Amino acid sequence: MKRFPVTLTRRTLLASAAAVLVAAPLPTLAQTAWPTKPVKIVVPFAPGGTTDILARVVANELTKAFGQPFVVDNRAGAGGNFGSDIVAKAAPDVYALLMGTVGTHGINKALYNKLSFDPVKDFTPITLVAGVPNVMVLNADKARALGITSVADFITYAKANPGKLNMASSGNGTAIHMAGELFKAMTGTYMLHFPYRGSGPALMDMVGGSMD
């Protein structure tokens, strides 16, 4: 995918915030120094995951750049739809931005029959923050017990033991979930899917041994 550099300036952020805060009158915002109060960055997943970590880095830099606190607000649920809905329907006097993902603004539109918001019309993109690869990991103790040292070993075991391995994801419809389903389809394997409210809790359970 070709990426175009985007410079995040006060004018750019002001225009995009006005578009996200759809009820805010543009003339008023244009005449007012922005922001005049703290700004909420909604992360539609649980703390500790990639989206949350990136949001906190961005919030720290924006706080220094604009002189007002940018505060991360985790609102997990429904594969990112819960937090996205909060920002889409934010009141005019609320400064709210969303740290969206390919899941919240791409996959969910196709996955859910009806969303309470329009991921295109109710938001204006500001900038691409990061491109994040998907990585498959297996609990270390489980890998040693099963003698799995490679992806090929993993596929061989999964094919021979359908349903005996479980797969944690950051939520139904997320990019991680879709990547896992694609892996199963491409390899002819079957693993039980357990959706979490973010990659942070999923990773903790995988390290703890309750997830493979």
Q: Where are the language model's segments positioned?
A:
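Short, well-ordered beta-strand elements
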Residues: 37-45, 71, 96, 164-168
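N-terminal secretory signal peptides
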Residues: 1-8, 15-24
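Short, polar/charged alpha-helical segment
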Residues: 48-67, 177-185
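Hinge/capping helix and adjacent helix->loop/strand transition within the periplasmic-binding protein
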Residues: 89-95, 110-201
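Extracytoplasmic "Venus flytrap"
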Residues: 41-54, 76-78, 169-174
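Short, hydrophobic alpha-helical packing/hinge segments within bilobed ligand-binding/sensory domains
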Residues: 81-84, 202-203
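Sec/Tat signal peptide C-region and signal peptidase I cleavage site
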Residues: 26-30
